[in-house]
Regions:
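Interfacial segments of alpha-helical transmembrane regions
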Residues: 2-17, 66-81
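Hydrophobic alpha-helical membrane segments
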Residues: 57, 77-91, 115
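Interfacial loop at the N-terminal end of multi-pass membrane proteins
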Residues: 6, 26-51, 94-101
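Physicochemical signature of membrane-embedded alpha-helices that form the seven-helix bundle of GPCRs
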Residues: 12-15, 56, 77-80, 105, ...
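Membrane-water interface at the C-terminal end of transmembrane alpha helices
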Residues: 115-134
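Core segments of alpha-helical transmembrane spans in multipass integral membrane proteins
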Residues: 18-27, 42-66, 82-86
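Individual transmembrane alpha-helices with interfacial aromatic-anchor signatures
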Residues: 50-51, 101-116
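Membrane-helix boundary connector in multi-pass membrane proteins
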Residues: 90-107, 126
Length: 134
């Protein structure tokens, strides 16, 4: 059971890495960002911020891969996935009707990642409390 939880943690981290690497295409410019998020990027300031966001997400993706390959960092990586994705889910909920269909897709992907990362972390904590190594 323990190795399965550990394996699941690796899968969740790699899935999160893939999801966070996809926006890197946004660095290429407004057309790619339009395809990803269905937002107008005519304003240069917004375009700069979104392109920078794409780079930051790629850095996160690399960190998630590193954590997946480092057993001692998996819980840290899963916690990062949880914080990153839960923050978007919370902000999206507070934003009300501000989501277009593309952002709703991002929202639901993040809901799944929140559920998966929280589940693995809870199982790991439970195993530690019960005296097993997760």
């Amino acid at each position: 059971m323990i190795s399965r939880v550990d394996d699941l943690g690796v899968v969740v981290l790699l899935l999160a890495a893939l999801v966070h690497a996809l926006p890197l295409l946004g660095v290429l410019g407004g057309d790619q960002l339009q395809k990803l998020y269905a937002v107008q990027t005519d304003e240069p300031t917004l375009l700069l911020l979104l392109r920078h966001r794409a780079v930051l997400f790629a850095v996160l993706a690399a960190v998630f891969v590193y954590c997946a390959m480092s057993p001692s960092l998996r819980s840290v990586g899963l916690s990062m996935v949880l914080v990153c994705t839960a923050s978007f889910v919370l902000l999206a909920q507070l934003g009300g009707d501000a989501m277009n269909p593309a952002l709703k897709r991002v929202f639901w992907v993040d809901v799944i990642l929140v559920s998966l990362s929280a589940s693995v972390l809870l199982i790991q904590v439970g195993a530690r409390v019960l005296g097993a190594k997760a």
